[in-house]
Regions:
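The canonical Cys-X-X-Cys-His
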Residues: 39, 43-54, 105, 109
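Short cysteine/histidine-rich zinc-coordinating motifs and their immediately flanking basic loops
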Residues: 59-65
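Flexible coil segments in periplasmic/lumen-exposed cytochrome c-class electron-transfer proteins
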Residues: 24-26, 94-136
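Extracytoplasmic/secreted proteins, especially bacterial periplasmic and envelope-associated proteins
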Residues: 34, 38, 42, 59, ...
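Electron-transfer interface patches adjacent to heme c in soluble/periplasmic c-type cytochromes
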Residues: 65-83, 91-103
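Conserved beta-strand positions that form and line the central face of beta-propeller blades
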Residues: 29-30, 54, 63
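Bacterial N-terminal signal peptides
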Residues: 1-14
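Electrostatic cytochrome c docking/interface patches
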Residues: 19-42, 93
Length: 136
């Protein structure tokens, strides 16, 4: 007795490239240099006391550059990082940064980790994740 199996593959032109195009990473230039400069000023005022001026962390807070940042957040979305940061920072008043200030500080953190700037500002919406931007 012979049993036959049939496997069908349907290819929709452009679908694969459309799906791949939706997933971006922080290596794709997801913030502007001007935004990172604003973020530097905001970081200095709101974050440097605990995370240090060089973003390497201290007794009270982890570093935000190098392996500490990369190993802690690799594979997560930038939205997840923003949501966590918004919920827990600044430590003395979590959630008090404006969405613009939070995006600017994240742009500064990305810049400090040598991720490239791009042509459009980072504009994460804390109400919904939107298109995922992967931390790589």
């Amino acid at each position: 007795q012979v049993i036959a199996f049939s496997v069908g593959v349907f290819v929709v032109p452009g679908l694969t490239s459309d799906l791949l195009a939706q997933e971006r990473s922080i290596s794709d230039g997801v913030y502007t240099a001007e935004q990172a400069a604003r973020g530097n000023r905001e970081y200095t005022q709101q974050c440097a006391t605990c995370h240090s001026t060089n973003l390497r962390g201290g007794e009270m807070a982890p570093g935000l550059v190098g392996q500490t940042f990369i190993s802690g957040w690799s594979g997560e979305t930038l939205w997840t990082f923003a949501d966590y940061t918004n919920a827990t920072m600044p430590q003395d008043s979590p959630g008090n940064l404006s969405v613009q200030a939070l995006n600017d500080v994240i742009a500064f953190i990305l810049s400090s980790n040598d991720y490239p700037a791009g042509d459009a500002e980072l504009s994460l919406d804390l109400e919904s994740e939107g298109d995922p931007i992967i931390i790589d």
